[in-house]
Amino acid sequence: MTEGAGHRDGELPDDLTAAEAGMWQAFRNGSVYDLSSGDALVDDPHGGRAWGPERTVRARIVCWLLLDGPPALAGRVSSLQLVGVRISDTMDLAGGTVDPYVELRACRFDREVLLPETRFTTVRLVDCSVPRLEAARLQTEGDLHLPRCRFRSGIRLTDAQIGTDLLLNQAVVHRDRSGRSIAADGMTVGQDLQAEMLESHGEVSLRSAQVGVSLSLRGARLLNPYTRHALNAPQLTVERTLYMTPAGLGSPLLRGTTPAQGTRIQRFECEGGVRLDDGRFGDAVDFEHARFTFTDEQELSLRRVQTPELRFLGERPARGRVVLSGARVVNLMDRADSWPGPGRLHMG
């Protein structure tokens, strides 16, 4: 059978591999398609163990299912739910509209995932290995989940529109050729942006981004010794609170509460400058227990920031400056030992 012919009647295409045929049938049934072996070392998508043809599907077959797939079986709702699957070649859904629910767990992509101007309902990639996610102007009606994924060459979400929540908890993101780990200028998130215990190697760029509820960087590590900023987010708007505070190591993460005695915590750490100039925060900016590591030329810049409350309760930065020129803060919560030394605080 030629590609596309007869598939609307549910007939299985002739040229599918055994792994792809199983995925096709699971899609029609709306069931999870699990190709993991049961061996944790072998199944680690970020490990070095090879995954052979028995657990490999071609990206174009995945795209075929998502863009123009067969009908669901009677009484079922079609969906793509993969576990432990290797996806070969480039997954290119650029400009497409994807109606089925998509959830991939512990999967491995050989090449970048291309989603620019793609429309989804909800899409979840959990604990996946992805060379790069290219998703400028992506639109989702619901959530975009990327927790525990690892991206070797960055994420691009410029001008993306996320209908509800964006989750980046425990993701590891390395920089692209331009030095950015996450490029999300102009992005809009309808509800929460959670990047708790995110590990970023490069610049996180959120210029003019908008978050409908809170932005949580609890326990995150933003590391950018390469260029000026680890977080570059002028004109950022957060309707409630920006958290750069600790997270609990374990489940659930701390959410602004006092941890039980003996609970291990991971503080928010930033190596590189932070630029929040002209930001608008509806409830608070919270730096409790934050650790900033700057060079002499770098700074925590809060020029013209507007917030009802600033919780400046982090560690004193040994180098660099803190700049609050033109900031409008109603209530300041601070400690004397949180501010930088003489000559390194600028408020005029």
Please annotate each region the language model reported.
Residues M1-G348:
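N-terminal leader/targeting and pre-domain segments
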